[in-house]
Regions:
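Short, Lys/Arg-rich, polar N-terminal cytosolic tail immediately upstream
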Residues: 1-2
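Hydrophobic alpha-helical membrane-insertion segments, chiefly the h-region
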Residues: 22-31
Length: 263
């Protein structure tokens, strides 16, 4: 009786110990799985209205686009320590009324920018504007950015004169001398013309970002929708051509439709 009881008492702690070990392994597995999920990064994000208060959020992205005019060199160093690639927004084709330099260059505006009341198209052919953009891009380069996200080359679509084409080209070729990534946002009319003239686009860009390939924006109602098949097919063909030229291709879509997101 005692031996039997002792036998049971001997086995019970061993069984409990094994159970606790299994439970511990299970908990560790769940913790590691949750940690892996927590630190799984998104590929790409564009955050033009953000400032340094969003640094923690940016750590969940492999590559981000920010307006580095509102960040310090130290901010960008912290993002690099996290392994995040940082591109800076740079508007070369329009002038925004909230910039501190607006009053200096407002006289160079050449037309209203539809749907964007705070912006006006700017004369990129003007030497003063080209010099200013050169200085600004130098300052951003010195902050340690990995590349430039160039906006509003579409000024050539708005005003397709030779001087505008040459002005954009001069600005882009100067930025390319930094040896950093140069991503053109949109600008298909200008890029297509450059390719037609020179046969390649690697002298002005390393990548392209295209908005609204699959989605669309109704500015009058402030709602999102699906892009027309005609426009979608046009942009897909354009982007395929860019990719064939060896540049990186990024998409920026505006939608809350899960089915459209999956596309």
């Amino acid at each position: 009786m005692w031996e039997a009881l002792c036998g049971k008492r001997t086995k019970q702690p061993v069984a409990l110990a094994v159970l606790f070990v299994l439970m511990f392994i299970g908990v560790c597995f769940l913790v590691k799985a949750n940690q892996a999920k927590e630190f799984e990064k998104n590929d790409y994000g564009v955050f033009l209205n953000a400032d340094a208060s969003s640094l923690e959020r940016f750590k969940t992205y492999e590559t981000i686009v920010i307006d580095a005019q509102y960040f310090t060199k130290r901010d960008i160093e912290l993002l690099h320590q996290n392994g995040t690639v940082v591109y800076t927004y740079l508007n070369i084709g329009s002038i925004e009324n909230f910039r501190e330099y607006y009053t200096t260059y407002a006289e160079l505006a050449i037309g209203e920018y539809e749907h964007w009341e705070e912006e006006e198209w700017v004369d990129v052919a003007n030497p003063d504007w080209q010099k200013f953009i050169g200085q600004l891009s130098q300052e951003l380069y010195e902050k340690g950015v990995d590349g430039f996200f160039i906006d509003n080359c579409d000024v050539y679509y708005y005003d397709p004169h030779e001087s505008i084409f040459e002005g954009i080209t001069a600005i882009l070729q100067n930025i390319m001398t930094f040896g950093k990534a140069v991503i053109i946002n949109g600008g298909d009319t200008y890029v297509a013309e450059y390719r037609e003239r020179y046969g390649a686009i690697d002298q002005i860009m390393t990548g392209v970002n295209q908005e609204s390939v699959w989605s669309s924006i109704d500015f009058d109602s402030g709602t999102f929708g699906e892009q027309t098949s005609e426009t979608r097919d046009y942009f897909c063909k354009y982007l395929e051509t860019c990719k064939a030229d060896g540049v990186e291709v990024y998409l920026l879509e505006y939608t809350t439709n899960q089915k459209l997101i999956q596309k």
